[in-house]
Amino acid sequence: MVTGNVTGAASISERPARAMSFLPAGDFVVADLEYTTWPGAMVRGWSDPGEFREIVQIGAVRVAHGDSLCETDALSFLVRPTLNPVLSDYFMALTGITSDDVAEHGTTLESALQDFVAFTDGLPVLTHGGDDRVIVAECARKSLTNPMDETTWQDIRPPFEAYTGRKMMSSDLPAHFGLPDQGRSHDALADSRALLRVLAHLQEAGKLAS
């Protein structure tokens, strides 16, 4: 959820001939989280006093996996942080989410995770950056039972970094592969959809397989 740089778009024809192979055989979910952050927090690993990666937004799309990849359902909701209920100016500028937004429209982390696991309905969940580890840490920190303990998670950032030779955020990937920008970056649902567009593009081009 932190900013990254794109140094130029690359067409499919410019990528290596090999195909990535990580798609689940059946339907799956693509998900993204937005969590509290401050200037420099990522570099120092959220290690300053009072810095915690508290979930503020969950976004996800359910994907039908056939000859093409198609979105069949979506969710997006805000979560009220409790350790840092007042969001940093940095976070608000990055995401467009304000403290008033989460105070008025946010739900509890426990409720959000219950709704999220119901949405996934046993399907594997793909993330770009290991967001499951954020959920595990949040539940441990707040003494909550993790309802997604049995969920199959797959972090697809490593194969993308190996394929492109670059470290990028999920919101940067469409531009890298020459796809038009659609939606605000650092919005959990928009970033989930951005990642799905890239997956669908690569599958259609024969560069991505199960």
List each model region and its residues.
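Acidic two-metal-ion nuclease catalytic site recognized across multiple nuclease folds
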Residues: 1-23, 176, 196-210
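Short, motif-level signal for alpha-helix interfacial/capping segments enriched in acidic residues
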Residues: 4-16, 132-135, 166-171
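Conserved non-catalytic scaffold segment of RNase H-like nuclease domains
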Residues: 13-29, 33-133, 148, 175-180
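Active-site flanking residues adjacent to catalytic metal/cofactor-binding acidic residues
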Residues: 31, 154, 190
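Short, glycine/acidic-enriched loop or turn micro-motifs at the edges of active sites
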Residues: 35-37, 158, 194
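Acidic, Mg2+-coordinating catalytic module of metal-dependent nucleases/exonucleases
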Residues: 120-134, 138-139, 169-210
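A short alpha->loop->secondary-structure connector
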Residues: 141-150
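Short alpha-helix plus adjacent loop in nuclease-associated cores
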Residues: 153-168
